[in-house]
């Protein structure tokens, strides 16, 4: 039996992208081969709560780093999966090195905007010291290799088919088109550009799903420029987001800094053509076939205007997007992770014998 610890949350209501990934993987891992220990601050995902050989360590208001580190030192896991960048990760990496713990380090890199100048010492250490390092797109894998990662693998995030799937019936042509944005309201997500594009197309409805510190500024912008075709939806559950995607006609995602955003895969699975930036080279979007990847604000706006004006192009891209999204399956992804865990443990064992 292999014991895997991950500093990820089992909570059912936690929709952080990294935690969503781990929950999907853990829920599918073979319980006869893998015992999993993870964190919990609320009610667990029922699939994880019902999984045998699974333990959820409670995350409390105080003292978590010391308490959980003590657990890891007295119950040393075979693998430490998906380190983050908090004090627990820093403490464990230090203990692993100084005590030469048997725990294999399986590093998964998913965040964009990385460079040699990035002030992220915990992540950089996890990349350098990982027994196996993986990233969530081809572009991210190349980036991580440039930062010192060795033999970096590409492991995509899958798509949760419980929530993200095409409409079962042919979409009825609506009187007004709908453009959807989904993401946190942070400066780099560029929700402000969604509002500005909405002002150019008053005949189209724009729906923005998400919450964050920039939401108030975006609401004020919409009011100041007289934009009455914008609807702010707030934070949505996965079920609600899937429903919004099936009602929409286009996903407009102008975010500037990304790793490989799951929302693009989710939208594709719902048959939505996507307009996004080409800077992070998302594999969920095939440029010119399932959507459009653009390099500037102006090019994003041009691509969006073209999709709004050309219904035949939207239909072609919609069908191609749903077909392309079928490649991203969680069962296959979980199989990759199980093989990676075993490989990392063997590598760690060999390195400790030297």
Give the location of each predicted region:
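Short hydrophobic beta-strand element within catalytic cores of glycosyltransferases
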Residues: 273-276
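Conserved acidic donor-binding segment of nucleotide-sugar-dependent glycosyltransferases
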Residues: 287-298, 306-311
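A short, histidine- and acid-enriched strand-loop-helix "catalytic/donor-clamping" loop
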Residues: 9-10, 88, 103-119
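Conserved donor-binding/catalytic core segment of Leloir-type glycosyltransferases
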Residues: 3-5, 172-189, 195-201, 207
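Carbohydrate-associated surface elements
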Residues: 139, 158
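Short alpha-helical donor nucleotide-sugar binding micro-motif in glycosyltransferases
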Residues: 127, 235-236, 243-248
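Aromatic "clamp/platform" in nucleotide-sugar-dependent glycosyltransferases that forms part
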Residues: 256
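Nucleotide-activated donor-binding/catalytic signature segment of Leloir-type glycosyltransferases, i.e.
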Residues: 219-236
């Amino acid at each position: 039996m292999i014991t895997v610890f991950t500093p990820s949350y089992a909570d059912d209501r936690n929709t952080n992208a990294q935690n969503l990934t781990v929950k999907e993987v853990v829920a599918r891992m073979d319980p006869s081969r893998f015992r999993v220990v993870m964190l919990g601050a609320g009610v667990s995902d029922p699939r994880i709560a019902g999984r045998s050989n699974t333990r959820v360590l409670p995350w409390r208001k105080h003292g978590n780093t010391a308490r959980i580190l003590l657990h890891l030192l007295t119950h040393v896991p075979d693998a430490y999966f998906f380190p983050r960048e908090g004090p627990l990760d820093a403490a464990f990496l230090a203990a692993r090195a100084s005590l030469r713990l048997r725990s294999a380090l399986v590093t998964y890199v998913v965040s964009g905007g990385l460079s040699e100048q990035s002030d992220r010492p915990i992540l950089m250490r996890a990349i350098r010291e990982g027994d196996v390092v993986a990233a969530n797109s081809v572009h991210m894998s190349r980036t991580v290799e440039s930062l010192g990662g060795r033999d970096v693998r590409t492991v995509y995030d899958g798509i949760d088919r419980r929530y993200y799937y095409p409409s079962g019936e042919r979409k009825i042509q609506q009187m007004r088109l709908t453009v959807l944005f989904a993401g946190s309201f942070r400066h780099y997500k560029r929700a402000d550009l969604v509002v500005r594009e909405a002002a150019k197309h008053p005949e189209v409805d724009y729906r923005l799903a998400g919450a964050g510190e920039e939401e108030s500024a975006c609401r004020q912008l919409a009011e100041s420029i007289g934009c009455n075709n914008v609807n702010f939806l707030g934070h949505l559950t996965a079920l609600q987001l899937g429903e919004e995607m099936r009602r929409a006609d286009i996903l407009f995602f102008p975010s500037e800094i990304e790793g490989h955003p799951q929302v693009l895969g989710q939208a594709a699975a719902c048959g939505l053509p996507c307009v996004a930036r080409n800077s992070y080279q998302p594999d969920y979007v095939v440029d010119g076939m399932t959507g459009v990847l653009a390099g500037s604000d102006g090019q994003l706006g041009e691509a969006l205007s073209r999709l709004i004006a050309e219904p035949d192009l939207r239909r072609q891209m919609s069908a191609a997007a749903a077909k392309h999204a079928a490649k991203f399956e969680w069962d296959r992804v979980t199989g990759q992770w199980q093989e990676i865990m075993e490989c990392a443990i063997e590598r760690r064992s060999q390195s400790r014998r030297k």
